[in-house]
């Protein structure tokens, strides 16, 4: 997907969202059945923000509808809408059941993401996310496995490490990327993780490769040194890569970073990385 297309899509979503904010609840409810997916999502997001018993009730009804599009939008709304405490268990259980059993892979993926959002609001559901992921991590659907990696990133539980290592080897780049992100954000570390990251230094997916570089650098694994050095010499260098150079703690990177001071405008990040290396 090109950056131009993504920008246009984001612009449309932003415009539709602002339009939906001006509508009353009944008008938003009707838009949930619109043929335009962007209108459905925009109205759902406004309903999430507003909350209210009617919106929650309708979303729950949608979750058991014969139409998979309705089930999908219902699961999406329930992920982040404000609900009363006594309703939390019921809503999570509905989403959990959909994540495991819905016939539509699209709905399962949305339900998984929504269980993660509910867990963000109430970490008591972390064990259920772990249990759920033991099944969904092996789903045939790429979207479901990607959603699972995202859900695992929300919790911190070492029981998920074997699942994440398996997802690091997934044939799909988005799945690998989210699995690597989940490992890095939770600061998991063992020899299997590091070895996987070393293999991923040659990944064709740039985002996956960047996560691997960051992961190895923060773990002070010098096997990343040559690849990191090559990244720093490119015409376009991500801030995360510069920060990773500082974290690796190898002073041989100092000349490369010094050269970058005269090449890029954002000297603060580069200077910070240089200072870290000098102190290491």
From Swiss-Prot:
InterPro entries: ARM-like, ARM-type_fold
Taxonomy, superkingdom: Bacteria
Gene3D superfamilies for the chain: Leucine-rich Repeat Variant (1.25.10.10)
Gene Ontology MF, one: oxidoreductase activity
GO biological process, one term: response to radiation
Name this protein carries in UniProt: Protein YibA
Organism: Escherichia coli (strain K12)
UniProt gene name: yibA
């Amino acid at each position: 997907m090109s950056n131009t297309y993504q920008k246009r899509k984001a612009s449309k979503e932003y415009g539709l969202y602002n339009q939906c904010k001006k509508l009353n609840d009944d008008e938003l409810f009707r838009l949930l059945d619109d043929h335009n997916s962007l209108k459905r999502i925009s109205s759902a997001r406004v309903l999430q923000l507003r909350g209210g018993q009617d919106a929650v009730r309708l979303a729950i009804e949608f979750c058991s509808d014969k139409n998979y599009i309705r089930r999908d939008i219902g699961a999406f709304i329930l992920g982040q809408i404000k609900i009363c405490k006594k309703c939390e268990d019921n809503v999570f259980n509905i989403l959990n059941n959909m994540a495991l059993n819905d016939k539509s892979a699209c709905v399962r993926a949305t339900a998984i993401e929504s269980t993660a959002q509910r867990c963000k609001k109430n970490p008591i559901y972390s064990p259920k996310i772990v249990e759920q992921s033991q099944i969904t991590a092996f789903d045939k659907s790429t979207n479901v496995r990607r959603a699972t990696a995202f859900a695992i990133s929300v919790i911190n539980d070492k029981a998920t490490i074997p699942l994440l290592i398996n997802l690091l080897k997934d044939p799909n780049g988005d799945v690998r990327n989210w699995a690597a992100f989940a490992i890095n954000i939770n600061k998991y570390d063992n020899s299997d993780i590091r070895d996987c990251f070393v293999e991923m230094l040659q990944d064709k997916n740039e985002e996956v490769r960047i996560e691997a570089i960051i992961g190895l650098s923060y773990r002070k694994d010098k096997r990343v040194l040559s690849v990191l050095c090559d990244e720093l010499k490119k015409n376009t260098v991500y801030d995360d890569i510069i920060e990773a150079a500082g974290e690796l703690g190898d002073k041989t990177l100092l000349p490369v970073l010094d050269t970058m001071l005269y090449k890029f405008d954002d000297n603060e990040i580069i200077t910070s990385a240089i200072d870290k290396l000098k102190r290491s």
